[in-house]
């Protein structure tokens, strides 16, 4: 039987995994220049992902027009997921 701590950890891990998918979607859609980021659902996607990604802008300079902030952001989230997964109690 799982206790409350495991439930909180599993919910947090699931949220972080969904957030990684949102970042990947935002990153993939960035290659399409005709997308209007002020129309729905693109506006909501950018409002959810851009504040986090902006934390990492400028950490590494762009190379050949490629922004590395999503890679840094996803790596950090993945590291946090790994730390939280280790705290889960085995069944």
Swiss-Prot record:
It is found in: Plastid, Chloroplast. InterPro entries: CCB3/YggT. One of its GO terms (biological process) is nucleoid organization. One of its GO terms (cellular component) is chloroplast. Pfam families: YGGT. Signal peptide: none annotated. The keyword tRNA processing does not apply. Its main location: plastid. Keywords: Chloroplast, Plastid. The keyword Chloroplast applies. It comes from the Eukaryota. Belongs to the ycf19 family. PANTHER family: PROTEIN COFACTOR ASSEMBLY OF COMPLEX C SUBUNIT B CCB3, CHLOROPLASTIC-RELATED, YLMG HOMOLOG PROTEIN 2, CHLOROPLASTIC. This is Uncharacterized protein ycf19. It comes from Cyanidium caldarium (Red alga). The gene is ycf19.
